[in-house]
């Protein structure tokens, strides 16, 4: 089983990032995924020894417009195909070669889609894909939403997702999915 922390929209909130890192102690997190806004905020996670996977956000314009940095990524974890994107749909800052999130979702190319941008945490299923927005870690521009991040526990046939709320580090949303008969993914 692999345990992954997912965060988004940190917007240079160093105190929220420190709070997040203190919550990671003892959780046996192997990887941290940062979904952008702000790309450079994630460096401190790498410095603390986490294996970092990241994509830039739309406020990371110098990175988002750099063709050497992938705005969207497809990774595999325990045989689950996971699509990483800052926005849940195409954005006017996208590069021509960027995959369009809505097309990836419509054609069921992935099992899980991780995105941020809206600051609104949630776990949903659409068109056979589990959609996860970890929310945000930005005390200044929360848009009325609490500070949240996600923990994914993934094994070959099961996905457990928890949206954790700070500063209490309490579970706000919890859902479990499994691979059903054939290729389907169903909520347990």
Regions found by a protein language model. Give the residues of each.
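N-terminal active-site segment of His-dependent metallophosphoesterases
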Residues: 1-50, 67-71, 145-146, 175-188
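Active-site environment of divalent metal-dependent phosphoester hydrolases
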Residues: 11-15, 38-43, 59-64, 90-95, ...
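A short, polar/proline- and glycine-enriched secondary-structure boundary/capping micro-motif
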Residues: 16, 93-98, 143, 169-178
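Helix-adjacent hinge/juxtasegments
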Residues: 53-109
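Conserved beta-sheet core of the metallophosphoesterase superfamily
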Residues: 53-54, 93-158
